[in-house]
């Protein structure tokens, strides 16, 4: 017999070699029906796997991330099987689960067309109806290589050869289809009830542009048709809110072929950017930060000292000046460190908070560039805090409170993740443990729930990541707090302590927006271009009914302009309906209509975005309410 402990701490006895699915059936018929995979002592297993050891046992459904990944990965295999049936000469590369779906990379004899997706979907439906069992088996390295060589699967042969010695080489079979895979997978193809193939894209083999370009087919899948319908509706809404589309329509920014990944901000886009930066500056001033500006290009010696040359070089751009190597900065921290190091500091000055809206450049492959969300140059709202060890917790809590204030202004909910030491890192185990525990203590004292994100910290320290949730329920990683004991050591940073001796300060790296460009992209999609009044590029448009109302319209325009309102005057010889519709299309918060009655009464007819006609108002009353709305950032 074996003992299995369940998530509710209940322990039960079972016969040895019972399968995970059989365990599920003893718990609940519904759970057995919905379960997709299981785990024993933290290791994910197929439902068909026999359990021969005691330990902690858990089942996963589509409600769990683990269940979603298994379902989507099985869907990728389903698609690959359909492709091989329809296009037998196609070679298989890789097909993982990804956030919200799956993909598979293929090397077809002839390029796939959008029409082919319909054929592939139809074949997938047939395979689902066949309800083929999905079975795991193992081969030796030589057997695995021979198996794929005989099938002409050159990419799979390469993958097998790269598997380290001593690692088990597992496969999954469903009907005539076999794929190299660690698993786990759902028990049969009949589980994969609802799916949709979305699009075809190019992808280099192994992400290396020196390799062959393959065709990647993306798809989504769900256990119920209703869930698929809901998701496709969500995609339609997301398309309407695409910041690239809205940015073009509202003339906010553009992306030019002369500079892929380098966005151009237009006058209206600069209004949004400047408002965000002005707000950022004022809040940081009140929170005790001092703003600095550091150079974009610094020499190789600096980046070697900081560790970026060894750990981040593939993401950097380089140039030569007077035969010396220089790099365009990918991060602001070394520049901030040089500002700190420029003079001697006393413990009485701490904490020292240096903030910078710094332009950074990072090398991104052209295939991953995406509007403002993934670019090659962006402005990072960095700050670096130098402090005494005993000030660490209070400073982290202070940064958390500042980030919370920013996000709540825009109506964002968020969750927090604590990212720990990555494989490619610098520093001792002791310093990493000290830094990680300091972040945990601050989060717990602040009462913020968090989840651990293993191995996703920066190379110089662990970090807290803030993930925003937008109006469509999507999450975006923006704010970050990183605790760093490494850089002060690398740059020999010191302060004079109370004892008159030199000591090493502790350093925090933190951002609120993250990338200003990316945050603007998120805001465009969150608001669908209908920004709150204080952020809107044009806050009011004055619309005249006829030629004779032009003088009064100009008077209203001038009064608003003199009060600092961003205002436009539309006195064109067009119909009033046309001018109102155009103002609505441009998502202007307030349209003021002026005609005979308004001139007579010294009023304006107000139309508010999203509300409609508010009727006539005395102009003095309207401007008082408008200025209050702007001032209070409502």
Swiss-Prot record:
It is found in: Cytoplasm. One of its GO terms (biological process) is threonyl-tRNA aminoacylation. It comes from the Bacteria. InterPro entries: aa-tRNA-synt_IIb, aa-tRNA-synth_II, aa-tRNA-synth_II/BPL/LPL, Anticodon-bd, Anticodon-bd_dom_sf, Beta-grasp_dom_sf, TGS, TGS-like. Its cofactor is Zn(2+). Residues 1-61 form the TGS domain. GO terms for cellular component: cytoplasm. One of its GO terms (molecular function) is catalytic activity, acting on a protein. Keywords: Aminoacyl-tRNA synthetase, ATP-binding, Cytoplasm, Ligase, Metal-binding, Nucleotide-binding, Protein biosynthesis, RNA-binding, tRNA-binding, Zinc. Its main location: cytoplasm. Its EC number is 6.1.1.3. Signal peptide: none annotated. The keyword Zinc applies. Zn(2+) binds at residues 333, 384, 509. It catalyses: tRNA(Thr) + L-threonine + ATP = L-threonyl-tRNA(Thr) + AMP + diphosphate + H(+). Residues 242-532 are annotated as: Catalytic. Belongs to the class-II aminoacyl-tRNA synthetase family. Homodimer. NCBIfam families: thrS (TIGR00418). This is Threonine--tRNA ligase.
């Amino acid at each position: 017999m074996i003992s299995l402990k369940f998530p509710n701490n209940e322990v039960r006895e079972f016969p040895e070699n019972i399968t995970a699915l059989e365990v599920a059936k003893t718990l609940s018929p519904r759970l057995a029906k919905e379960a997709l995979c299981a785990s024993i002592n933290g290791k994910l297993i197929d439902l068909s796997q026999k359990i021969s050891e005691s330990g902690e046992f858990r089942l996963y459904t589509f409600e769990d991330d683990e269940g979603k990944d298994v379902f989507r990965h099985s869907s990728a295999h389903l698609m690959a099987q359909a492709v091989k049936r329809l296009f037998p000469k196609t070679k298989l590369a890789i097909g993982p689960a990804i956030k919200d779906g799956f993909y598979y990379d293929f090397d077809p004899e002839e390029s796939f067309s959008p029409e082919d997706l319909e054929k592939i979907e139809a074949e997938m439906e047939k395979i689902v109806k066949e309800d083929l069992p999905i079975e795991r088996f193992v081969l030796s390295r030589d057997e695995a290589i021979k198996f794929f060589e005989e099938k002409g699967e050159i990419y799979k042969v390469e993958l097998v050869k790269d598997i380290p010695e001593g690692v088990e080489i597992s496969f999954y079979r469903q009907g005539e289809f076999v794929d190299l895979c660690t698993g786990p997978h759902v028990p049969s193809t009949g589980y994969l009830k609802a799916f949709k193939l979305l699009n075809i894209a190019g992808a280099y083999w192994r992400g290396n542009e020196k390799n062959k370009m393959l065709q990647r087919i993306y798809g989504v899948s769900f256990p119920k048709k209703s869930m698929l319908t809901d998701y496709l509706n969500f995609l339609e809404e997301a398309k309407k809110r695409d910041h690239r589309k809205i940015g073009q329509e509202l003339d906010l920014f553009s992306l030019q072929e002369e500079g892929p990944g380098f966005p151009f901000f237009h006058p209206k886009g600069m209004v949004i950017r400047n408002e965000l930066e002005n707000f950022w500056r004022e809040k940081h001033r009140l929170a005790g930060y001092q703003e600095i500006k550091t150079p974009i290009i610094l020499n190789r010696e600096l980046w070697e000292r900081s560790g970026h040359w060894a750990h981040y070089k593939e993401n950097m751009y380089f140039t030569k000046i007077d035969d010396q190597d220089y790099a365009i900065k990918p991060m602001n921290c070394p520049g901030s460190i040089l500002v700190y190091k420029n003079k001697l500091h006393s413990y009485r000055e701490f904490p020292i908070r240096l903030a910078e809206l710094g332009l950074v450049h990072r090398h991104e492959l052209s295939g991953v560039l995406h509007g403002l969300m993934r670019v090659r140059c962006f402005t990072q709202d960095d700050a670096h805090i130098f402090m005494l060890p005993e000030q660490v917790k209070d400073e982290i809590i202070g940064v958390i409170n500042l980030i919370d204030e920013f996000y709540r202004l825009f109506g964002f909910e968020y969750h927090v993740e604590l990212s720990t030491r990555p494989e490619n890192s610098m520093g001792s185990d002791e310093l990493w443990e000290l830094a990680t525990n300091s972040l945990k203590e601050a989060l717990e004292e602040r009462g913020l729930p968090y989840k651990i994100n293993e191995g996703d910290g920066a190379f110089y320290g662990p970090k807290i990541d803030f993930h925003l949730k937008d109006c469509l329920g999507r999450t975006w990683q923006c704010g970050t707090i990183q605790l760093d004991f490494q850089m002060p050591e690398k740059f020999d940073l010191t302060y004079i302590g109370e004892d008159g001796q030199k000591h090493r300060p502790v350093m925090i790296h933190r951002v609120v927006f993250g990338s200003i460009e990316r945050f603007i992209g998120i805001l465009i999609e969150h608001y669908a271009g209908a920004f709150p009044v204080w952020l809107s590029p044009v806050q009011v448009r004055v619309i005249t009914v006829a030629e004779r109302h032009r003088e009064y319209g100009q008077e209203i325009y001038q009064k608003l302009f003199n009060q600092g309102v961003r205002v436009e005057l539309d006195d064109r010889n067009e119909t009033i309906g046309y001018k109102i519709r155009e103002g609505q299309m441009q998502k202007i918060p307030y349209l003021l209509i002026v005609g005979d009655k308004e001139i007579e009464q010294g009023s304006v007819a107000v139309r508010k975005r999203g509300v409609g006609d508010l009727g006539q108002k005395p102009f003095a009353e309207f401007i008082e309410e408008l200025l209050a709305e702007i001032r209070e950032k409502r």
